[in-house]
Amino acid sequence: VRGTRGGFIRELIESKKYTPEEFAAVQNERKSRGQSANADDGKIVEQQGMTMREKLEHMTATYSDRLTFAKSNIHGWGLVAKVFHKAGSIVTQFKGETCRSTVADIRESRYEEDGVDCYLLKQDDDTVVDCTFQGNYARFTNHSCNPYMYSKIVKVDNENHIIFFARTDIKAGEELTYNYRFESEDGKVPCYCGAQNCRGYLC
């Protein structure tokens, strides 16, 4: 996304798979870190005990209270947390116009010819979400080789949604990032995420 040439995102990253024991250990560790890391004014994203539909509704209702965008040290504008988000909580949905993959390919070529930053993310084998001209703050999410968020396809009311979850505890004021794992058709695109494990390129 973010105006990279040939940067149409064709795959989402699969979440790490845990055994029940490993998952419980990770959750306990995250809870302990979350209690000590909260230096905010008491506003914390809490989603325990909610159904997925309720979580999505809560995400939408609190969107502008939790998220904003600002100039980024990585590239252009970036998505920024306004409050503390616990690891594992829903951060945002990648919203936009849903179109077929064939249409997305045509649009990407047109955006590139017109010099327009394109925001395209694959939802499933047949559909892509185009956030270029309509969508939410999620389109300002920059790439990082060590991101704060990971994605999952969540089905609610028989509709797929691309949801970004907090990969770790996120403090207010931190830029929210995601590993897009681009497929570039025009050569490697430099990465400026600044992470210690930065690969140097987006693909």
Each language-model region and where it sits:
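Catalytic cores of histone-lysine modification enzymes
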Residues: 30, 38-153
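Alpha-helical interaction segments
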Residues: 8, 13, 67, 109, ...
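Accessory low-complexity/Zn-finger-associated flanking regions
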Residues: 1-77, 189-190, 195-203
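Compositionally biased, intrinsically disordered low-complexity regions enriched in proline and serine
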Residues: 19, 64, 112, 120, ...
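Generic detection of intrinsically disordered/low-complexity segments and helix-coil linkers/edges
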Residues: 2, 12, 17, 57, ...
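C-terminal SET catalytic tail plus cysteine-rich post-SET Zn-binding segment of SAM-dependent SET-domain
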Residues: 145-203
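Intrinsically disordered, low-complexity segments enriched in small/polar residues
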Residues: 6, 16, 21, 109, ...
